[in-house]
Design a protein with these regions (language model features):
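Generic recognition of stable, solvent-exposed alpha-helical segments in well-folded globular domains
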Residues: 17, 102-105, 151, 155, ...
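Acyltransferase donor/substrate-recognition loop-hinge adjacent to the catalytic core
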Residues: 3, 150-230
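A conserved beta-strand-loop-helix scaffold within acyl/acetyltransferase catalytic domains
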Residues: 22-64, 72-82, 209-313
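Catalytic cores of nucleotide-enabled group-transfer and carboxylate-activating enzymes in metabolic
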Residues: 14, 35-46, 53-62, 67-71, ...
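Acyl-donor binding region in acyl/amide transferases
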Residues: 83-164, 286-328
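Generic start-of-chain signal for non-secretory N-termini
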Residues: 1-31
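A structural signal for short, well-ordered beta-strand segments and their strand-loop junctions
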Residues: 120-127, 168-175, 258
């Protein structure tokens, strides 16, 4: 039985095959939440993703006996490497069958490509930026995933350890039960912080206003707030424009909490949305012909679960209780 590794050409058809493999691998798994196929294709396309302005990347597919058996993308983020003074290769968008030969061939190919590009270390799974799926699940395989998080089979970590990879950091996902009413202590803290720093919550009535008035500032706040986080890749102006157009038109205004100062400048934001997990599972990540109906129902209807996508607080306001205002 032979394994072959094929470099991916960034054409629509080959990218679709690449994305589809990652979804088909989990077709019998009830906890896996597929990405939106079109978004994933655009993320991997140099013509669509402005991250390629600052990144080099090469994607590969593994085939065993002529059948798709694995996929992986090698990424060099020049901004991160320059900022951290490292020669680091990232790997991401990785999936594979439970087969030593396939996994070894995939990672050897990526490592060899990295060496030809002058890289000295390898780390992952990471994306082009922190807007991409990152990390590898090592616990909680019986929990349904979210649109923003990674899900993978338990055997993944075993293969990584077998090849000599070691865990660098833990990312933890929490499930929080929302109380029926805000605790008095929490409400008092929010009021104290609001008065002390002259802050206020912005009533959001129009997605258009959010995009035009706050869109750029929101992602620049994320750049500031996340600058010291593990593996963070600051977004360029073109990336910010891209994400403003891609995401802010889809938000539910009642799921966004935005805090501004006396100059109407954003100092903190929290963005959540009704869980799209079940809608994505039903649609298998496809909008057409009927997938959009499942997603629209999930987005517009009542949901027992809300996914908290991000919270960002301006550095000078961190550790000062501003989170109480966001969640109040």
């Amino acid at each position: 039985m032979s394994v072959t590794i094929t470099p991916l050409k960034p054409t629509r058809s080959e990218l679709l095959r690449y994305v589809k493999f990652g979804i088909d691998l989990y077709k019998d798994n009830d906890c896996y939440v597929p990405p939106l196929v079109l978004d994933e294709i655009d993320t991997l396309s140099p013509k669509k993703n402005p991250a390629f302005d600052v990144c080099r990347a090469k994607s590969f597919m593994a085939y065993k006996d002529g059948r798709p058996a694995g996929r992986i993308t090698a990424i060099i983020n020049n901004v991160v490497n320059s900022r951290n003074k490292v020669k680091e290769l990232r790997f991401g968008f990785v999936d594979f069958i439970d087969d030593d030969e396939v996994v070894d061939a995939l990672f050897k190919t990526v490592e060899d490509w990295g060496r030809t590009q002058g890289m000295e270390t390898i780390i992952g799974p990471l994306g082009f930026s922190d807007m991409d799926h990152e990390g590898m699940l090592i616990d909680g395989f019986d929990q349904i995933g979210t649109i923003a998080t990674i899900y993978n089979y338990p055997y993944y970590a075993g293969h990584m350890e077998r090849m000599g990879y070691t865990k660098d950091i833990d990312w933890v996902e929490y499930r929080i039960k929302i109380p029926e009413s805000i605790p008095d202590k929490y409400a008092r803290i929010a009021q104290i912080v609001k008065t002390k720093y002259n802050l206020r919550s912005v009533p959001l009535k129009s997605r258009k206003i959010v995009k035009e008035r706050y869109g750029q500032a929101l992602f620049k706040l994320i750049n500031e707030a996340y600058s010291d986080l593990y593996g963070f890749s600051p977004l360029t102006d073109r990336q910010i424009d891209h994400y403003v157009d891609q995401y802010l038109g889809l938000i539910r205004l009642d799921c966004v909490s935005m805090i501004v100062d006396s100059n109407d400048d954003i100092v903190a934001v929290g963005i959540s949305m009704p869980s799209l997990s079940k809608g994505l599972i039903k649609s298998r990540g496809k909008l057409f012909p009927t997938g959009w109906i499942h997603l629209l129902k999930a987005l517009k209807g009542k949901s027992e679960v809300v996914d908290l996508l991000l919270v960002a607080v301006k550095p000078e306001y961190q550790n000062k209780g501003v989170n109480a205002l966001i969640f109040n």
